[in-house]
């Protein structure tokens, strides 16, 4: 009797664990967005005071389009968003990273 119970419990556990793989993974809706759309959405989040979401979108923009026209701007915006979110340490780190990556950029003096 105990052997049958053990087999039933083991089979139930296996079925339960195998079912976890059937659930769809969370998809990133921004994965197929253009650089322009990512930038516009991030700026919109900044305008509405949603700095954490803006930072996430700017980081996604920078990682998806590292050599695009918005990459350097996204880095500057990340620093500004951290500053606006009262996170001075992260803002300073973002500024230092920008200066290290773009020492001759026209906006370095304003960082």
Q: In which residue ranges do the predicted regions lie?
A:
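Bacterial signal peptide processing site
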Residues: 21-25
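C-terminal motif of bacterial Sec signal peptides marking the signal peptidase cleavage site
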Residues: 16-19
